[in-house]
Amino acid sequence: IKPEDIEKELTAKWVKEDSFVPIKKIAKVKELDLLALDPDETIVEEQKRQEKLLKISGVMISDVEVREYPLKDEAAHLVGYVQNVTAEDLEKHAGEGYTNASVIGKTGLEGVYEKELKGENGCKIYIADSEGKEKEQLAYKIVKDGKDIKLTIDADLQAQLYKNFKSDKSCSIAMNPFTGEVLAMVSTPSYDTNAFIMGMSKKQWDRLNKDKKQPLYNRFRQVWCPGSTFKPVIAAIGLQSEAFTGTDNFGNEGHSWQKDKTWGTYHVTTLHTYSPVILKNALIYSDNIYFAKAALKIGTEEMERSLSMLGFHSSIPFEIMMAESKFSNNKHIQSEVGLADTGYGQGQVLVNPLHLACIYTSFCNDGNVLKPYLLYKENAKAEQWISEVFSKSVSQEVLEGIKSVVNDSHGTGYAIHRKDMILAGKTGTAEIKESQSDTTGTELGWFAVMTPDKKNKKPILIVSMVEDVKGIGGSGYVVKKDKAVLDKWFGKN
């Protein structure tokens, strides 16, 4: 704190000789934290700092009530924070009971549910006698507390996902695949929301705002290139539209393929060869060539129609506003190559992680896409966002395919398979580069995994995305991280 800032507060018009003048809010050091067997070093240092402050003549530390966020960094982008109202806030919310001393929800759920959480101030108007004591009450308005809001979020799961991914530029969504309850929403790196309550110095703000990893950026609200996690969606569209069957053999093309010479130098590449080249194997080996061919068989018109029906270029019905998934920059797939690239989650396809998780719910709910929700409901029943988008037989066939991705030893998600239950999932590595020959581009690593059995006592669906996985294992890096989360969720098998 600068001396001139302190002087400014001390010389305010309301200040009297015996006034306690608030200068800055600081975190209270709790005695229990200091008595821990291995107390946090930052807490110990803060205690020493406060002891030094109290040795300064005229300095006092007084307790005040402020909003506290116990999950701190773990749920910053989800919960958000409140701040003191600005002149703009007062103008925008004129007549809604805000004063210069009010706080208001700025981001996250604090902003979404500001009206419900705010409550109403109380007041009393009275006539005072010459000594300032109440003589006659003229009017009285009782304080009305804000509502308590209970979420579907599992705090332990939220914390575990954050812990596992906190050093990455990532986002994760966790849902109950049979109800639509959202169990976790994590964006990393993150920040301590309590810092906004206590007040930040310019230096602190600049450090946070200029961090190259962008801790203030909410990644789970954005759209990203999905890579191979999109292949089960293409599989379902192809089967539903009868463009092909699961047993159609697309033929072995080796590691590189193009439809014909009209594609110029452009080729679709894949990593593995196998036989027969049918849907189940294409999912197991994550074959780009198979799904490029699948997209061409589906055709542009059917692809656009089906993806639109799945909620692309539309808003997600959810408490927090999410960016809209899209299959093209202008709602139309422009070329044959663009259509082929769409088949394996490249091209201009961008998907919101929550949206992708919702689409995956259709594979274990007879082809119905469930509506996600955050507000807890007793004895909640699943609500359908998009009904019967796929038939029961189609969703079952795709589900069997993505079970194999995790449980077949050749599957790209085999590292997460368990002996005590069947999981289903799909890996994805999306390339972000200027051209096919560009070797300087980055990669996004994806993994979607779920418990497809309704009898599972702890059902879960996780979609995780990590930026910059090139050179550190691609999607395998994400599989490893999610495995640790599931081991904690279920217990190691």
Annotate each PLM feature.
Residues I1-E134, I142, S170-C171, P177, ...:
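Membrane-proximal periplasmic segments of bacterial cell-envelope enzymes
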Residues A382-Q384, V479-N493:
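Short, gly/Ser/Thr-rich active-site loops of penicillin-recognizing serine hydrolases
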Residues S57, E74-H77, D145-I149, D168-S170, ...:
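Envelope-exposed proteins and targeting segments
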Residues K106, L356, G474-L486:
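Short, charged, low-complexity patches
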Residues K13, D156-N176, E181, P189-N194:
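Beta-lactamase-like hydrolase cores
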Residues R49-L54, L161-K166, L374:
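Alpha-helix C-terminal capping segments
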Residues D129-L138, F178-T229, V233-V466, G474:
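Beta-lactam-recognizing serine transpeptidase/beta-lactamase-like catalytic domain environment
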Residues S130-C171:
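Conserved, well-ordered alpha-helix/loop/beta-strand core segments that scaffold catalytic motifs
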